[in-house]
Every structure is written in structure tokens, then in C-alpha cells.
Amino acid sequence: MIFQRTVKEMVKTTGVGLHSGNKVTLSIKPAPVNTGIVLVRTDLEPAVAIPAKADLVRETTMCTALVNDEGVRISTIEHLFAALAGLGIDNAVIEVDAPEIPIMDGSASPWVFLLQSVGIQEQASAKKYLRIKNTVRVEDGDKWAELKPFKGFRVDFAIDFNHPEIARSQQHMVMDFSTSAFVRDISRARTFGFMRDIEYLRANNLALGGSMENAVVLDEYRVLNPDGLRYEDEFVKHKILDAFGDLYVAGYAIVGEFCAFKTGHALNNQLVRALLAQQDAWELVSFEKDEAPVSFSVPTGAAVFT
């Protein structure tokens, strides 16, 4: 049987909020089976818990944000959620003392390192997968995203940016998901932005924590970061990373193929909502280890405790 996973013990880190520019402290704690991922705002009195559910994603401008019915929000969850999804962690309580998750280096890599360093604990209950039975598709102009049946988890993603540096890079990628492939090929891809947009955002008290330490920054012609790119195709890989995080608010690892063209946080969330609403399009399943359609084998050097 493939079992559910949580973190072996609590782990804590600090970073900077992308939009506020303020210091943020975050803790990831073990959680019982079938808890899912729950975020807690510890800076409020009393603390407010917000479960990671698709219908609580109520803000998708420049990031993915969970907002409860009282208006309490936790923003910029997507990179941390990509790491949780990539490592197959089903259950965790995430405590944060601010309205946003720290941006770290703009990728999922610091979260992967943090989670692997503390260890991953298998739990005494079967892991549930969301298997796609029928194709579900959403569109917005020329942008679209769909989930369709597939024996594993495959991503087929294309972007289309009219920028000389991005146009020179590979803007289309197909990958069959495994934890090893995610850690190696996707997790280090950083968010990217354009200098013209950053100047506008800062004038409006946004992206105050953004810098070349946590983003790939481009002017009209080139990448401005002195060290350049981490991958030749870092732009499309970061969009895939975002999608991994956005899809994880479905609550389960997906067995199916995710295909997308020019999609972002808003359309990713629309797809998850459309999928969950169409109950004949999916089913929850569990697997024996030798039947696993998706590999969550953690790379060498990281510990999984049984």
C-alpha cells in the first residue's frame, strides 16, 4: 500500500514577504491522516486556520491567495504548495505570522530543502489519488487548460511571451512527473518579472520585497540578473512549478495529464474548480506500491520514515 505522508517533525524558517517586504516566520508541523494542508495565521488573536481548498482561492492576481469567509487571507502559497505536491506530502499544518508566505528565492527549492532536511513520515493510512476519468477544460480567450485521463501524471505546458530573451528560450515542455524529475528539473525555476511592471507595482506599495535575490528580472531586451538563468528554459519551468502548486488545492495528487497554453493562477484555479464540480470526471483511488502510477520516491540523501 502507498501511504499518506506528513513531515517527521516541526521545521521553522524566516523570509521576506514579496509584497509587504516585511520579515515573515513560517513553521511546518506534522498533521494526522486525512488532515490535508491547513494554513494558520498566528499573528491574529485568536489564530485563524484556513484549509487549502479550491473554493477558498479567492485572489489570483500575481499569486494564489486563500481567503476565508471573514476576509482573512494568506497569499503567495503556490511555491510552497508545489514543494508539498512534489514531495507527496498529504498532511501538514503551516503556521505563518503574516498575510503572505515568504518568497524565499522565488522558486520551490528552499521549501524542498527544508522539507527534506526534516524528513518525511509515512502514516498508517492509504494515500488517495484523484484519477481523471473524463476530460475537463477551461478557456479564457486564447488561454486554456485541461485535465484528461492518463496512466501517470504528465504535464504538457506552453507559454508565449513576446520578449526577445524568453522567445530565445524553449517555451514548451512535456514532462512525466516524478519527485526526482520535479526536484531536478522544476523546483529551482524562479518567478520572473519585467522591470516596467516592478516599477509600477512598487509605486502602488506592491512587490516591496521583490529583488534579483528572489526573481528573474528582465528589461525590454535581456535578463538583468548578474548570474543569469538557472535553466535555459527557466520561464516555462516556473509556470509549470506554479501550476503544480495551484493544482494541489484539489487536495490530492492527480493521476492524469495536465495540458495548458498561457495559463496562470486564475485559470489553474478555474480548472480545479471545474474538475471538482464535475463529479463524474474523477474518482479517488489508492494503490499498492507495485501499482503506483506516480513516483514519489524521494531523491538520495533525503529521509522517508516508515
UniProtKB/Swiss-Prot annotation:
It is an enzyme of class 3 (hydrolase). Its EC number is 3.5.1.108. One of its GO terms (cellular component) is membrane. Signal peptide: none annotated. The active site is at 265 (proton donor). It comes from the Bacteria. This is UDP-3-O-acyl-N-acetylglucosamine deacetylase. It comes from Shewanella sediminis (strain HAW-EB3).
